[in-house]
Swiss-Prot record:
It comes from the Eukaryota. It comes from Kluyveromyces lactis (strain ATCC 8585 / CBS 2359 / DSM 70799 / NBRC 1267 / NRRL Y-1140 / WM37) (Yeast). The active site is at residues 12, 40. GO terms for molecular function: adenylosuccinate synthase activity; GTP binding; magnesium ion binding. GTP binds at residues 11-17, 39-41, 311, 337-339, 419-421. Its cofactor is Mg(2+). Belongs to the adenylosuccinate synthetase family. Its main location: cytoplasm. This is Adenylosuccinate synthetase.
Length: 432
């Protein structure tokens, strides 16, 4: 049985907290897309664990963890993150953590060219804005993957006597191509080659054929939780292109990023922040560049775990959520950070878009259209009381329940969990 946790907006919805809540019930936690370009924090017994690339199922000592073929891996960061987690007391990680042999490798030159490409794109764009990359080399790695010139984990750990020679040749070809494209840049390819050579033996114990790994687990009726990265509105196909990440962050990426058939997926949990945030550039129809936006930012402590960048803030956009549900097919929702709205007298919710007075029937794919949309809001009464100590759904203020019911009715998906505060256990469960 496979269940999936996916972000429904532009990321930073609080997926990690739900995974943290659920992980004790699962035998395996898997990641299917992205790299170390996203992050979340999990608190266990007062200890904070920061996750970027590694599956957060590592906090459960009885859980196996898989980094799937759809993930791109910067090997130095992999070991640094593992070392950091172990230094905080995480035990037996090495026997419970596995990497797909088909996952592509991120190199330092990918990270250098990521930043150069960002400058190039911002200089060529009409408004001078950039995509807002994290600079982790994710996009350039997926680019080499798509062009069939990338290097995968199995290329690095292959025991064939000629394997390292082939690896070196392909690696140097990749570097030369980028030097031809961008000229000379601060980078020592020979040093990185030797570093990766030293990683070969260290990495081998982690590497598995992930297709066999997953299908063997499914055959044995193991409970598997897939931990989504980023969110649907950052999906390379369905997000606000080009202000997106470079992988499929929706349900399709789970299937291709782990090599599992759709019929194995039972539940899809959509994680929804009670308002909306976005990091970096790109369309954001319900953004509030005013006192309300600042209030959401300050109360919600909206800063990125990976980049530290301030998040843009606005009201909940149900047009986005409904569109997200069309693609991902959520079986239930987790509304997070509802407590951030505790002090608002009135709360607005975006329910439709129009351009030049004409209502749009669906979420627009074109940024020129999206830039012109006028958002129609419904104003709901706030509850103006602290909900952080509430443990039962029925004890939530009446207006808080009405707010949640409005979301359920609009999207036509039941809400199963509600985040009521920053504490690990500040989550109300609702029977569905």
């Amino acid at each position: 049985m496979v269940n999936v946790v996916l972000g429904s907006q532009w990321g930073d919805e609080g997926k990690g907290k739900l995974v943290d809540l659920l992980v004790g019930e699962y035998d395996i936690v898997a990641r299917s897309a992205g790299g170390n370009n996203a992050g979340h924090t999990i608190v266990v017994n007062g200890v904070k664990y920061d996750f970027h690339m590694l599956p957060s199922g590592l906090v459960n000592p009885n859980c196996q963890n898989l980094i799937g073929n759809g993930v791109v891996i910067h090997v130095p960061s992999f070991f640094e993150e593992l070392k950091s987690l172990e230094a905080k007391g995480l035990k037996n990680a090495k026997g419970r953590l596995f990497i797909s042999s088909r996952a592509h490798l991120v190199f330092d030159f990918h990270q250098r060219t990521d930043k150069l490409r960002e400058l190039e794109l911002s200089g060529a764009s009409k408004d001078g804005k950039n995509i807002g990359t994290t600079g982790k080399g994710i996009g350039p790695t997926y680019s080499t993957k798509a062009s069939r010139s990338g290097l995968r984990v199995h290329h690095l750990v292959n025991d064939d006597p000629q394997a390292w020679e082939v690896f070196e040749t392909r690696y140097r070809r990749l570097v030369e191509t980028r030097q031809q494209r961008y000229g000379s840049f601060d980078y020592d390819p020979e040093e990185e080659l030797q570093r990766y050579k030293s990683y070969r033996e260290q990495l081998k114990p982690f590497v598995v054929d992930s297709v066999n790994f997953m299908h063997d687990a499914i055959k044995k009726n193991k409970k598997i939780l897939v931990e989504g990265a980023n969110a649907l509105m950052l999906d390379i196909d369905f997000g606000t292109y080009p202000y997106v990440t470079s992988s499929n962050t929706g349900i399709g990426g789970v299937i291709t990023g782990l090599g599992i058939p759709p019929r194995t997926i039972k539940e899809v949990f959509g994680v929804v922040k009670a308002y909306t945030t976005r990091v970096g550039e790109g369309p954001f129809p319900t953004e509030q560049l005013n006192e309300d936006g600042e209030k959401l930012q300050n109360i919600g402590a909206e800063f990125g775990v990976t980049t530290g960048r301030k998040r843009r803030c606005g009201w909940l956009d149900l047009v986005v959520l409904k569109y997200s549900n069309l693609i991902n097919g959520y079986t239930s929702l987790n509304i997070t950070k509802l407590d951030v709205l505790d002090t608002f007298k009135e709360i607005k919710v975006g329910v439709s878009y129009s351009v030049d007075g004409k209502k749009l029937e669906s979420f627009p794919e074109d940024l020129l259209t999206l830039a012109k949309v006028e958002v129609e809001y419904v104003t709901l009464p706030g509850w103006e009381e602290d909900i952080s100590k509430i443990t039962n759904y029925e004890d939530l203020p009446e207006n808080a329940q009405k707010y949640l019911k409005f979301i359920e009715d609009f999207v036509e998906v039941p809400i199963q969990w509600v985040g009521t505060g920053p504490a690990r256990d500040a989550m109300v469960h609702k029977e569905i």
